[in-house]
Structure formats: structure tokens, C-alpha cells
């Protein structure tokens, strides 16, 4: 028995090349595949990130939102504040172009994402209330937002996004649908 662990294959390698897990190799690294991200296997994405809607306000037309007044409202609008920002791992590249889910409805991110908060437009979800769950990526009702949208917007890969999720974001690990 060898005292050494020898590997060459990560998720996509082991999905595409049998040589990655045959002699002399005795270990594989299936890291990203464990989150459901491996194009060769067409896995179900299992990572999700949630936050809470902590404030809702109606703002008049021409109000500006975010640092540097990055977004100007064209009409009177319902605007919400989400308790998550770039310190939690939301890419700044999602400012004024990304989306979240509230009650299963796609809501645009407006303005520049700040360190601790993200502002969203709630005009399509007038029933939204403070405390509602906001899906940053994952599934809600029959809707889904993929983490791939974040990596595409940032021009990077999934590993960068997953590793960039901040330390203050609580991790919950599930097995067979139940939290451990």
C-alpha cells in the first residue's frame, strides 16, 4: 500500500478522462462537482445563497440609488434593501445588471452594490414584505437563478465566485435534503 496520495484529476478531468483515476493515481478531487457544477455530468446545482429583505420604500421618479447615484428611477418605484453586499461575495459586476428572486419573482439589482447591502426593484412584487427571503442564487418556487450568471457578469469562473463568498455568510450543509 502506498503512503502517498497521487492525483491529477479534478471534477471535469475525472468526468472526461479515465486515466485520471487509474493506476498510478489513487485520489481524485471532485470539489466543484460536489456543488453540482460539472458540465460533463449535467449535475443539479445544489449551492444556494439567501438573504433577507430588510427594508422596503416607495421612492419618487428621478430618485437616485446607490453610491455615485449609479441608478436613477424612471418612475415612482417600490425599492427594497437586501442584507447582503460585496463583503458577502456578491460581485460588484452585478451592480445595475444582476437579479435576485423575491417570492419566486425576478427582481433587478439597482444601483451599486455596497459592502453590506444590495438595493433591488420590487415593482413586480408589490406583496413583498420586510423579512422575506431573497434568493441571490438558487431556487425559489418555480424560478431559479444560477451562480453562473454571477461568474459570467464578473468574467470569471465558478470557483472564484464560490471561494469569494464571505466568512459572515452562514453555511448550512444538507444531506438527503435535511440540514446536518
Residue ranges of predicted features:
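Active-site anion/phosphate-binding pocket segments in diverse small-molecule metabolic enzymes
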Residues: 1-180
Amino acid at each position: 500500500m502506498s503512503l502517498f496520495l497521487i492525483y491529477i484529476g479534478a471534477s471535469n478531468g475525472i468526468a472526461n478522462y479515465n486515466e485520471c483515476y487509474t493506476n498510478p493515481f489513487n485520489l481524485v478531487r471532485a470539489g466543484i462537482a460536489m456543488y453540482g457544477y460539472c458540465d460533463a455530468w449535467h449535475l443539479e446545482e445544489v449551492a444556494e445563497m439567501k438573504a433577507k429583505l430588510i427594508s422596503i420604500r416607495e421612492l419618487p421618479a428621478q430618485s437616485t440609488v446607490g453610491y455615485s447615484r449609479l441608478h436613477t428611477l424612471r418612475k415612482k418605484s417600490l425599492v427594497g434593501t437586501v442584507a447582503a453586499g460585496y463583503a458577502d461575495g456578491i460581485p460588484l459586476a452585478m451592480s445595475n445588471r444582476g437579479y435576485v428572486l423575491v417570492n419566486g419573482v425576478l427582481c433587478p439589482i439597482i444601483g451599486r452594490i455596497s459592502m453590506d447591502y444590495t438595493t433591488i426593484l420590487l415593482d413586480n412584487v408589490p406583496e413583498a414584505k420586510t423579512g422575506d427571503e431573497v434568493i441571490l442564487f438558487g431556487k425559489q418556487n418555480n424560478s431559479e437563478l444560477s451562480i453562473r450568471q454571477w461568474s459570467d457578469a464578473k468574467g470569471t469562473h465558478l470557483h472564484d465566485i464560490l471561494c469569494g463568498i464571505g466568512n459572515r455568510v452562514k453555511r448550512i450543509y444538507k444531506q438527503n435534503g435535511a440540514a446536518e
